[in-house]
């Protein structure tokens, strides 16, 4: 600034700086500075200085008054805490005076200064305050006190996208919409010159209409002129961080806005797949996958992801040099994934979102998680002994969006001369402010009405769909009714036929009964004569045969009668079922008609609500256009209803039972149409009246503004004339006043333009009202025509009623006929039962008479019974032998039970021995008897011991035999396979050799022909016949070649099939072998347990020597451990949690059972060889940062060779190839660069190795998991000890296990550490069948070596 400028211009520039909200010395900033000074100086130690004490005594009271007048936290009511982070929390608040709802973010000043290198609160404030973008959360106010920074933002009631993804399976259509909105939001931030650096679903919030806005700009950073950023700290969330940001840790990080597009790719993948693409349980695992993204990025096979989506994800998740979006946002917008018919990039904000949140009130927090109260003590600034300036970094943070700044310096100087001008200006400003507020409120109302209109349209569409579905159901029901009536007629016809058959059968039965009665008479006569002669016996036999034949006939007839009865009952049941179906269908039809009428009523009510909402929006011309479209749609619906009525009436003629309901529908439709027309007329009249009122109100406002303007202009002109004559020095001031007037003129012109726009809208609305009136007249004419048609249809309905009555009478007659038939059937059944009783009596008499004739047969029967008894005895003997075999097979189970009983006996004996030692002084004789008893029990136990040892030896032999069989089978299989392969090779080589010989022969023949002299001499004189012969020969050769090729291809296909079959057999045999090995392992552990018990028994029962307790404990084998542990379910703790398994650790194996039943059946799900164990250790927070903090002390890790694993379900997993993780070799270590955001210490210098936001560059060995600072290697310091692990990491696997408590974890770790072999397991052959179930875990992270209680490293 030049010193030649006048004081007025200087003061004017100072005034502009004070009024500018972006200036560093505006009024709020100066007030913040005074407030901060008072806060920082008001301490007893500092007030000893006189200058400070004088300053405080001068300004402290005024600053306290200013604090009371400025915005503070007490101005808001806290509704609920909706979020909590590292620096503070987010509260849902309501302003006490305005009752408006906001989201207020609290940031702790102590935490900000403590982590000043990672706190970007200025960027967050500036972006939200000055963005003016619909894609960024708006900041209304920012203020502070001595402990917190406060940011009052707009409340987003839809929650974040994490909540949406947890509640819905996001389809690709939704993913396209939300990804497009994220792209536009990031473009808005990039256009302001910032990079977000922490794009994730947690920072994407949904407003009340379901649209997305970005939030949490605490990691944003300002770009330089080249659009790049320099940063040496890795900022962001591990799953979403880009490779170039990871590389910036500890080095010269230089990257641009493309790091945000990487996070967008991760977000899109997570929406479509359900998990992040580089998921791992440990931080090192995620970071190594991100750095090796070319090989680790894969898509699951079970997800239907389009090619365009995969292409977009791969274009985002690639190197920054070729990443999509590096050259601008337009190349992202042009991608094929975003092509659709629903929305365009320009109208994306106006389209209806896929999910619109259902809100009960303005403070609805159903889309946010309930948070527990923060009971931790808050850290505050300590009382200083010298000046620290803790409040100075936050000077200028205060911001008010609607702040009216101080008037200009010129205006303050002219107060004495222009009081009237000031009052006029204030009045004009108030009126303009009121008009702006009205405009803002009307725009908000417009937006709300548009949203309501959209929701009501959606509801209308749903209702129309439901009406169509109900109409289709009604048609289906009517067709079903007609089919049922046809079936009913057919059944009645069948019933008549069956009745005729029943009558015929009854006649036959009567004739047969008469014949039976005659036969009975003849039998009685023959019985009397049988006592006198043998001839009568022969006749008796003949009569018996005849009787039997008659009985057979009777049985057949009775069977036929029973069948007829069954068929009759079935027919009656079917008739009753059909009648019930008919009734149900009629009831359903009635219910459907009622539901249709209710739906129509709801439809008209919704229309009334719609029109009421449109009536409130009379000032908007767009909604009147919607009204016109709705009226035309209503006309089309009336036409559609008319066609429906005609169709329904045509169907009513066929379906006679639905006539009454159709009349009700017609009446309802007439009433609804009349009501609809009246309501439309009333609404139109109300809209016209409201337009007149608004027009009058606007004209009054316009006149008042014009009058105020004219008065102000006259007075200003007078004052200007007076001041020109009186003061020439005040020209600059007059110029300023003229500028203000011109500004007011511009405002007035804008308001006039708005008024003209409103009047034009009003005229348009009046024209549209006229058009609506014409359309109403047309609809009234159509209504008269419809009434006439309805009358004709009512006449036809009366005719159909008469026909329905006739049909009902016919149905009643059929029902009466049915009842008569049922009565006749009941009588026939009674007669049949009486005949059956008579037949039984006759059969009893026959049996009594036949008793004498069957005496001679009894001897034969006795002989047969004797033979049968012998056979039974033989069968019993066979069964006894089989039971003996079964007992032999169950000797193992009996041996186990015996061992348990012998343990109990041993305990009893020990108790008896203890009592005997006490009573030995009193009764020596008793002692001797008890010793003899004990000797007997010992001998008995020794016998059982010998039996058990024999059984164990037998089992061992069987086990060895099984192993030998398995080996021989494997060797035979390998030999067979090698022989087949050799045979195939030999056959192929023969074919190749034959083809080669044929080829050489043909070439030789051609050479001979070419080298012949005759051929050379007569080359020019060659005849056409020779050429034809050669062509024939060539064709023959080609045919032979083709035949040979076909044969060869057939042979290849055949051998390929055989190979596939052999491979399938190999897989089956491998699975069977795995199962057998697992069962053998479980059996071996059981045998081992039995041996331990036997040893205990043998030691306890040795009476001769009684060793001390210490000696016995020393001689016992190491006890095994078993119990419940949890294993990661499907390898993903975050998504699927833990799975409980029963684990048994024996001397050689670790067995995993799904439950105790599997343990009893000896079928483990997984077996690990203890010989293949590398390492056992407790985990740290960095290893399993996805697990709960309470679970981390209970988790431990097992590291083992992958050939030592045997699983029940073998899953062939693809081995990842080409993975090249960057690691540094140093003293046998393989160091991987990493970062620790959780507590960890360097094992070389014992200094902290972690930080929440800016961790130092670190290294971790992927073998022994030693952690150290990267500087130790860079500076070549000899502080790191050599690596103690010598196994190959690529051949190793790890497993996480969760114990029930921390003590259990320690117990398992100490026990397994003792089991680790001193010599590490050797490498394995990768072609072995067991490697089918292994998976590549080269990038798995394992942490530091845990020290054992004895001091040795585990």
UniProtKB/Swiss-Prot annotation:
The way it spans or sits in the membrane comes to: Peripheral membrane protein
* Record SMART domains: C1, PH, S_TK_X, S_TKc
- Top-level enzyme category: transferase
Pfam families documented for this protein = PH_MRCK, Pkinase, Rho_Binding
UniProt subcellular location:
Cytoplasm; Cytoplasm, Cytoskeleton, Microtubule organizing center, Centrosome, Centriole; Golgi apparatus membrane; Cell projection, Bleb
In chain numbering, the residues marked as site (Cleavage) are 1113-1114
One GO biological process this protein is involved in is: neuron projection arborization
Q: Which residues carry this modification: N-acetylserine?
A: 2
UniProt entry keywords in alphabetical sequence: Acetylation, Apoptosis, ATP-binding, Cell membrane, Cell projection, Coiled coil, Cytoplasm, Cytoskeleton, Golgi apparatus, Kinase, Magnesium, Membrane, Metal-binding, Nucleotide-binding, Phosphoprotein, Serine/threonine-protein kinase, Transferase, Zinc, Zinc-finger
Q: Where is this region: RHOA binding?
A: 998-1010
**Which Gene Ontology CC terms are recorded?**
bleb; centriole; cytoplasmic stress granule; cytoskeleton; Golgi membrane; lamellipodium; plasma membrane; ruffle
Region SHROOM3 binding, residue ranges: 707-946
Tissue expression pattern: Highly expressed in brain, heart, lung, liver, stomach, spleen, kidney, testis, muscle, embryo and placenta.
Catalytic-site annotation from UniProt? 198 (proton acceptor)
Give the sites modified to Phosphoserine.
Answer: 1105, 1108, 1328
Reactions listed under catalytic activity: L-seryl-[protein] + ATP = O-phospho-L-seryl-[protein] + ADP + H(+); L-threonyl-[protein] + ATP = O-phospho-L-threonyl-[protein] + ADP + H(+)
Q: What cofactor does this chain's UniProt record say it requires? A: Mg(2+)
Q: Where is this region: Disordered?
A: 1333-1354
Q: What are the start and end residues of every segment in region (Interaction with FHOD1)?
A: 368-727
| Coiled-coil ranges from the UniProt annotation | 422-692, 1011-1102
* Principal subcellular localization: cytoplasm
The positions annotated for binding ATP are 82-90, 105
Give the function comment from the record. Protein kinase which is a key regulator of the actin cytoskeleton and cell polarity. Involved in regulation of smooth muscle contraction, actin cytoskeleton organization, stress fiber and focal adhesion formation, neurite retraction, cell adhesion and motility via phosphorylation of DAPK3, GFAP, LIMK1, LIMK2, MYL9/MLC2, TPPP, PFN1 and PPP1R12A. Phosphorylates FHOD1 and acts synergistically with it to promote SRC-dependent non-apoptotic plasma membrane blebbing. Phosphorylates JIP3 and regulates the recruitment of JNK to JIP3 upon UVB-induced stress.
Self-association and partners: Homodimer. Interacts with RHOA (activated by GTP), RHOB, RHOC, GEM, MYLC2B, RHOE, PPP1R12A, LIMK1, LIMK2, TSG101, CHORDC1, DAPK3, PFN1 and JIP3. Interacts with FHOD1 in a Src-dependent manner. Interacts with PTEN. Interacts with ITGB1BP1 (via N-terminus and PTB domain). Interacts with SHROOM3.
The identity of this protein, by name, is: Rho-associated protein kinase 1
Q: Which organism is it from?
A: Mus musculus
């Amino acid at each position: 600034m030049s010193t030649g400028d006048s004081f007025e211009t200087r003061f004017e520039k100072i005034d502009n700086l004070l009024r500018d909200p972006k200036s560093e010395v505006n009024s709020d900033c100066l007030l913040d500075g005074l407030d901060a000074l008072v806060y920082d100086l008001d301490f007893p130690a500092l007030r000893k200085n006189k200058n400070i004490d004088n300053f405080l005594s001068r300004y402290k009271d005024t600053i306290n008054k200013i604090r009371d007048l400025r915005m503070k936290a007490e101005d808001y009511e806290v509704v609920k805490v909706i979020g909590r982070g590292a620096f503070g929390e987010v509260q849902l608040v309501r302003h006490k005076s305005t009752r408006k709802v906001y989201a207020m973010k609290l940031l702790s000043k102590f935490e900000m200064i403590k982590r000043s290198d990672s706190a970007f609160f200025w960027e967050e404030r500036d972006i939200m305050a000055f963005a003016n973008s619909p894609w960024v959360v708006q900041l209304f106010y920012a203020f502070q006190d001595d402990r917190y920074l406060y940011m009052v933002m707009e409340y987003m009631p839809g929650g974040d996208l994490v909540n949406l993804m947890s509640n819905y399976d996001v389809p690709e259509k939704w993913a396209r919409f939300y990804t497009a909105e994220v792209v536009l939001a990031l473009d808005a931030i990039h256009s302001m010159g910032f990079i977000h650096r922490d794009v994730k679903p947690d920072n994407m919030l949904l407003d009340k209409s379901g649209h997305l806005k970005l939030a949490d700009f605490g990691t944003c950073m300002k770009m330089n002129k080249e659009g790049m950023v320099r940063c040496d700290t890795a900022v962001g969330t591990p799953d979403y961080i880009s490779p170039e940001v990871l590389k910036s840790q500890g080095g010269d990080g230089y990257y641009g806005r493309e790091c945000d597009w990487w996070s967008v790719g991760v977000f899109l993948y997570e929406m479509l797949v359900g998990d992040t693409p580089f998921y791992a349980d440990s931080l090192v695992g995620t970071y190594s996958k991100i750095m090796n993204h070319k090989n680790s990025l894969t898509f699951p096979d079970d997800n239907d992801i389009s090619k365009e989506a995969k292409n977009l994800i791969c274009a985002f998740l690639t190197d920054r040099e070729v990443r999509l979006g590096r050259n601008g946002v337009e190349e992202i917008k042009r991608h094929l994934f975003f092509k659709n018919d629903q929305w365009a990039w320009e109208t994306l904000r106006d389209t209806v979102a896929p999910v619109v949140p259902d809100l009960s009130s303005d403070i609805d927090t159903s889309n946010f998680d309930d948070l527990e109260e923060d009971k931790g003590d808050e850290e505050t600034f300590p009382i200083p002994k010298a000046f620290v300036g803790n409040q100075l970094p936050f000077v200028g943070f205060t911001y008010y969006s609607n702040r009216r700044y101080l008037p200009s310096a010129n205006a303050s100087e002219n107060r004495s001369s222009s009081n009237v001008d000031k009052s006029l200006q204030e009045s004009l400003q108030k009126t303009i402010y009121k008009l702006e507020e009205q405009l803002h409120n009307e725009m908000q109302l417009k937006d709300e009405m548009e949203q309501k209109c959209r929701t009501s349209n959606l509801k209308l569409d749903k209702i129309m769909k439901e009406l169509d579905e109900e109409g289709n159901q009604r048609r289906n029901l009517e067709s079903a009714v007609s089919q049922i009536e046809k079936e009913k007629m057919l059944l009645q016809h069948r019933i008549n036929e069956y009745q005729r058959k029943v009558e015929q059968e009854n006649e036959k039965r009567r004739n047969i009964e008469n014949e039976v009665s005659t036969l009975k008479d003849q039998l009685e006569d023959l019985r009397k004569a049988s006592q006198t002669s043998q001839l009568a016996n022969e006749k008796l036999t003949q009569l018996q045969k005849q009787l039997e034949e008659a009985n057979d006939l009777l049985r057949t007839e009775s069977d036929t009668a029973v069948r007829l009865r069954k068929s009759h009952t079935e027919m009656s049941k079917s008739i009753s079922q059909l009648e019930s179906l008919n009734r149900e269908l009629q009831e359903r039809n009635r219910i459907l008609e009622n539901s249709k009428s209710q739906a129509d009523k709801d439809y008209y009510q919704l229309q009334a609500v719609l029109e009421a909402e449109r009536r409130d929006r009379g000032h908007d011309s767009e909604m009147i256009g919607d009204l016109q479209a709705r009226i035309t749609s209503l006309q089309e619906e009336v036409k559609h209803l008319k066609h429906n009525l005609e169709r329904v009436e045509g169907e009513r003629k066929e379906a006679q039972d639905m006539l009454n309901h159709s009349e009700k529908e017609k009446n309802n439709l007439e009433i609804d149409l009349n009501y609809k027309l009246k309501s439309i007329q009333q609404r139109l009249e109300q809209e016209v009246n409201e337009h007149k009122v608004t027009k009058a109100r606007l004209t009054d406002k316009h006149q008042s503004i014009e009058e105020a303007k004219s008065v102000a202009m006259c007075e200003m002109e007078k004052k200007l004339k007076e001041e020109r004559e009186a003061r020439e020095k005040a020209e600059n001031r007059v110029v300023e006043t003229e500028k203000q007037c011109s500004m007011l003129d511009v405002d007035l012109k804008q308001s006039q333009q708005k008024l003209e726009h409103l009047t034009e809208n009003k005229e348009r609305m009046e024209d549209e009202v006229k058009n609506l009136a014409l359309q109403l007249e047309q609809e009234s004419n159509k209504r008269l025509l419809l009434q006439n048609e309805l009358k004709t249809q009512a006449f036809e309905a009366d005719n159909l009623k008469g026909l329905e009555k006739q049909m009902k009478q016919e149905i009643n007659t059929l029902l009466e006929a049915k009842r008569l038939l049922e009565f006749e059937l009941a009588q026939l059944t009674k007669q049949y039962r009486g005949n059956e009783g008579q037949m039984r009596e006759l059969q009893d008499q026959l049996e009594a008479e036949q008793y004498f004739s069957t005496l001679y047969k009894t001897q034969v029967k006795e002989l047969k019974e004797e033979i049968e008894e012998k056979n039974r005895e033989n069968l019993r003997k066979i069964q006894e032998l089989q039971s003996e075999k079964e007992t032999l097979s169950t000797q193992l189970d009996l041996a186990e039970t015996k061992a348990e009983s012998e343990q109990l006996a041993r305990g009893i004996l020990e108790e008896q021995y203890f009592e005997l030692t006490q009573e030995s002084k009193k009764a020596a004789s008793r002692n001797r008897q008890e010793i003899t008893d004990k000797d007997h029990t010992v001998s008995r136990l020794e016998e059982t011991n010998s039996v058990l040892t024999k059984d164990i030896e037998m089992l061992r032999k069987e086990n060895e035999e099984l192993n030998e069989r398995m080996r021989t089978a494997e060797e035979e299989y390998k030999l067979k396979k090698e022989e087949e392969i050799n045979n195939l090779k030999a056959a192929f080589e023969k074919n190749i050799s034959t083809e080669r010989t044929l080829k050489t022969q043909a070439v030789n023949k051609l050479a001979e022909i070419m080298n012949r002299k005759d051929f050379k001499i007569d080359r020019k004189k060659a005849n056409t016949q020779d050429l034809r012969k050669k062509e024939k020969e060539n064709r023959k050769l080609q045919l032979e070649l083709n035949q040979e090729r076909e044969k060869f291809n057939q042979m290849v296909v055949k051998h390929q099939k055989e190979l596939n079959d052999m491979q399938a057999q190999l897989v089956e045999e491998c699975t069977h072998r795995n199962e057998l090995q697992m069962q053998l392992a479980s059996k071996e552990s059981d045998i081992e347990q039995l041996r331990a018990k036997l040893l205990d028994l043998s030691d306890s029962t040795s009476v001769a020597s009684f060793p001390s307790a210490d000696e016995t404990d020393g001689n016992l084998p190491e006890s095994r451990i078993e119990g419940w542990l949890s294993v990661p379910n499907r390898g993903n703790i975050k998504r699927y949690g833990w799975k409980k398994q029963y684990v048994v650790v024996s001397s050689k194996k670790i067995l995993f059972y799904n439950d105790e039943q599997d343990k009893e059946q000896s079928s483990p799900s997984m077996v690990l060889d203890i010989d293949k164990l590398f390492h056992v250790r407790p985990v740290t927070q960095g290893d399993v940062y996805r697990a709960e903090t309470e679970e981390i002390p209970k988790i431990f890790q097992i590291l083992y060779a992958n050939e030592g694993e045997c699983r029940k379900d073998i899953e062939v997993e693809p081995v990842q190839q080409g993975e090249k993780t960057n690691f540094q070799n140093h003293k046998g270590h393989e160091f991987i660069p990493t970062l620790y955001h959780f507590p960890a210490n360097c094992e070389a210098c014992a200094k902290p190795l972690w930080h929440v936001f800016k961790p130092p560059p670190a290294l971790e060995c992927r073998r022994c998991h030693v952690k150290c600072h990267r500087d130790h290697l860079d500076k070549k310091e000899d502080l790191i000890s050599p690596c103690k692990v010598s196994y190959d990491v690529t051949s190793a696997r790890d497993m996480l296990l969760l114990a029930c408590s921390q003590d259990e974890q320690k117990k398992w770790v100490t026990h397994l550490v003792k089991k680790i072999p001193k010599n590490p397991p050797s490498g394995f052959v990768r072609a072995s069948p067991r490697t089918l179930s292994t998976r590549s875990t080269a990038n798995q992270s394992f942490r530091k070596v845990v020290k054992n209680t004895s001091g040795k490293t585990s």
